[in-house]
Amino acid sequence: MKEREKKYIALWQVMQRECRRLVSRPLYLFCMVIAPLFCYIFFTTLMDSGLPKDLPARVVDMDDSSTSRNIVRNLDAFSQTGVVAHYSNVTDARIAMQEGKIYGFFYLPKGLSAEAQSQRQPTISFYTNYSYLIAGSLLFRDMKMMGELTSGAAARTMLYAKGATENQAMAYLQPIVIDTHPLNNPWLNYSVYLCNTLIPGVLMLLIFMVTVYSIGVEIKDRTAREWLRMSNNSIYIALAGKLLPHTIVFFIMGIFYNVYLYGFLHFPCNSGIFPMIFATLCLVLASQCCGIVMIGTLPTLRLGLSFASLWGVISFSISGFSFPVMAMHPVLQALSNLFPLRHYFLIYVDQALNGYSMAYSWTNYMALLIFMMLPFFVVHRLKEALVYYKYIP
């Protein structure tokens, strides 16, 4: 019993020591509280409208007829497209697009109205700048739809002139009606699409960095032996006492972003907020354990931080929220399982979007649990580094 009490006392002393270190260095306050809060507010307010609106586009109207002006007005009525000016020739419009003043332009050739009425199939052209993927894609969608609507309106007018009824004309123009229902994010809101993974990803990256730094700085400042002596030379007590205060702070920050996203901003959360809070706790613990592995594998502060930053940044690309993993190379599909953010993203899709039970995502929870077990493979190497390694500036 006395031995167990000594362990609890040692754990408490290490936690007190770490709390003193946390409040004595502003870097911890910035990385654990200020930076996450800034990212929460920054990303959610950056895309608060959901989709970009009134993207600047221009029109080259060589026809200048009532038909062409009606087309321009209808194009400007789309919420994503804002017709800001007219050009008299294609060259000026192309130069403006290359200079970044507009994201695209719509070209209406001379004689458009006359050729449409005489069934000579005039050609409408539109150009979008895909150097800006989102802006180019949205303008392309609006301009393509406007071209299809213009073609359909011309054909409908011709059918009416031939005596067809409205039902006959619509059956000819659209023999099959498509009823589209986007699932889980019916508003096509980019904030819902990105923030639910970007914000946990930023928190995960900060956990990597803070965990590596808090252990690596003990080696750099030559206080590692003092830290171990306070923990009765137990690396497990030393790590638990050091990282438990971090866990509490980061978990509070995780609860905050869940309440902020699903309670305040009302993002889709079909299974309730508590499964997502539990997934956040698993992500925090898995990220801390990955940080231990990083500094245990490379027990140098600069190399450990480089490892943490590289692994964290790659997580955003390979987790699958921006580009589907199933479309990646098979090797990358396998490697994606080595990143905690990937499993958190899959849990988010199952729980928040699809509303499945937690049992449906058991493989992803098991993967996060495996990440929590990884430090057992490096703790002895890490202890040797804490005792014998000499930091070389």
What residue spans do the PLM features occupy?
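Alpha-helical membrane-protein architecture signal
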Residues: 8, 12-16, 192, 231-232, ...
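Membrane-spanning alpha-helical segments of multipass transporters and channels
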Residues: 64, 248, 256-260, 268-393
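Hydrophobic alpha-helical transmembrane segments of multi-pass membrane transport proteins
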Residues: 38-41, 181-261
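Hydrophobic alpha-helical segments typical of transmembrane helices
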Residues: 67-71, 211, 223, 347
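Extracytoplasmic/periplasmic domains immediately adjacent to an N-terminal transmembrane anchor
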Residues: 1-190, 385, 392-393
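Cytoplasmic juxtamembrane interface segments
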Residues: 120-137, 182, 213, 291-313
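Residues that define the loop-to-transmembrane-helix transition and helix capping
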Residues: 26-27, 236, 302
